[in-house]
């Protein structure tokens, strides 16, 4: 009886050992198969940097729009693509829709030119846009207006009528 148990244990051990060897061989084959595959990826250094055009609004002169990008490279799969963009509507468009400036307060009115000016320094440039470091803008001086006498006289008339009603 002991001999039979011994034979069964040997068979179980041999089966487990063979299963272990089989698993090791399968894992080794899978790893070897991965190493043999040639690299299909194109190196990033073969493609040039993306160069983006200015943002072109879909409608009007601000809001949502698109820009086109191009890059060079013989092995590049994609050399052109379109990207969605947005031009803020509160930016000064005369200096470029992609350049944001921080402006100082308006200066005093120049009586010779009837203009007042202020300067702005570059705060931010979107998508590597080429922007001037400082810009100057001018606008006509506002007319110096005196308080309207009509407005004051209307107030006085109303107050006078109120006093008359109170006296009655």
UniProtKB/Swiss-Prot annotation:
Induction: By heparin and retinoic acid.
One of the record's GO molecular function terms: carbohydrate binding
GO biological process: bone mineralization; cell surface receptor protein tyrosine phosphatase signaling pathway; decidualization; dendrite arborization; dendrite regeneration; estrous cycle; integrin-mediated signaling pathway; learning
Signal peptide start and end residues: 1-32
Cysteine pairings via disulfide bonds: 47-76, 55-85, 62-89, 99-131, 109-141
Main location: secreted
Keywords: Disulfide bond, Growth factor, Heparin-binding, Mitogen, Secreted, Signal
Region annotated Chondroitin sulfate A binding, chain positions: 147-168
Pfam families cross-referenced by the UniProt entry: PTN_MK_C, PTN_MK_N
GO cellular component terms, semicolon-separated: endoplasmic reticulum; extracellular region; extracellular space; plasma membrane; protein-containing complex; Schaffer collateral - CA1 synapse
UniProt modification remark: Phosphorylated by NEK6.
Region of interest called Chondroitin sulfate binding, as start-end residue ranges on this chain: 92-99, 123-131
Residue span of region Disordered: 139-168
InterPro entries: Midkine_heparin-bd_GF, PTN/MK_C_dom, PTN/MK_C_dom_sf, PTN/MK_diS_sf, PTN/MK_N_dom, PTN/MK_N_dom_sf, PTN_MK_heparin-bd_GF_CS
Known function: Secreted growth factor that mediates its signal through cell-surface proteoglycan and non-proteoglycan receptors. Binds cell-surface proteoglycan receptor via their chondroitin sulfate (CS) groups. Thereby regulates many processes like cell proliferation, cell survival, cell growth, cell differentiation and cell migration in several tissues namely neuron and bone. Also plays a role in synaptic plasticity and learning-related behavior by inhibiting long-term synaptic potentiation.
Family per similarity comment: Belongs to the pleiotrophin family.
Subunit structure: Interacts with ALK and NEK6. Interacts with PTPRZ1 (via chondroitin sulfate groups); promotes formation of homooligomers; oligomerization impairs tyrosine phosphatase activity. Forms a complex with PTPRZ1 and CTNNB1; this complex inactivates PTPRZ1 protein tyrosine phosphatase activity through PTN interaction and stimulates tyrosine phosphorylation of CTNNB1. Interacts with ITGB3 and ITGA5. Forms a complex with PTPRZ1 and integrin alpha-V/beta-3 (ITGAV:ITGB3) that stimulates endothelial cell migration through ITGB3 'Tyr-773' phosphorylation.
This protein's name: Pleiotrophin
Gene that encodes the chain: PTN
